[in-house]
Amino acid sequence: MKIVFRKDIINAAVAPLMSGVSTKMTLAATEGILIEASLPNVCVLTTYDIEKGVRMTIEADVIEAGSAIVSASKFSQIVRVMDGNDITLTIDDRNCATIVSGRSSHTMTALPAKDFPEIPRLVSSQGFTAPRHIVRGMMAKCMYAMGVNDQRPVLNGLFFSVSNGKLHTVSCDSFKMATCATETDLMGLDGSETVEDAKFILPNKSVSELYKLLNDKDEDSLVTVYMSRKNIIFVMGDITFFSKLIEGEYIDYNRIILRNHRIKIFLDREEFISALEHAALITEEKVAGSVRSHVRLEAEGSVLKISATSGTGSAYDEVAIGHEGDDIVIAFNNRYLIDSLRACNADRIKISLSSPLTSINIEPNDDDSCATDEDLFMLLPVRMKD
């Protein structure tokens, strides 16, 4: 096999391909890029770690067709430092790969293409097309609340659903939950405006990699989703991302959201986050090998008092608020609270709560012009020590 790549094209392709490279070092082929070259100028590049993978088709001058696997990390490093505009990759019958550009050359050992794990074939008429920036934005609001090694496997990922023309995303663990729903320009796979209801759970590692791949400043860019019971494919221009799905029924999240709270607090989101970041100097300080992560909030009239104390010091701040209902004292894991506030994309927010021991809801303020989506972020408090 012999291929001549343009340096800018192959470098642009390698970066997203790394999303599908295995880091567990269990199978050598999953640490590599499968290169499949066919005459006259088509080159297909694939990475796959058994759980998720990326495939790209790029233009290249194919002098001799063939296929092989090269180390992803070494190949990406080599093509990045090559000086010439063109990079020539040659792989001989002994699986010796030679990479040449200008006066520079590198050699490395390749693997036969037959060693690459078989990629699941997905034949499905179920799916939809949506704006990339909308899907990415909804993922950004919910990713922080996904479970990690939760005993309930369905919580170790991001739940997507399409119903009544709306796209929903939900994530949840034992302490926090994020939900987002928005009406957007969805299309069926046949190009029509009729979209069948659908739902799936994408594993958290796949969520993180897909989020990177969806990054596109062009708001007209689309992502097309094809799904089956066990697997899913996202097509974004020249990039195809495929992943296994988490099987099982997602929790009935609407049932656990408390709606009728008797206390409402209205405040500036950035000002609140700034005060909590000050408190984080105390809450995230290690004392005797452990981290004291709780922050205490006291809503009294038109002031929210924020305090944190450890064996080495304390922090105190105040934020002006609008306040409906009784005064209250409540405590939270400070980092969870900050993450929830960062996910709520609004200038002013509403916090609804009832007691120091029940969950709170964080939402964009109803009067906020930025609040076009149906976003809700729920967080459980922690029990305060006397």
Short names for language-model regions:
Residues M1-D386:
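Structural preference for solvent-exposed beta-strand-turn elements
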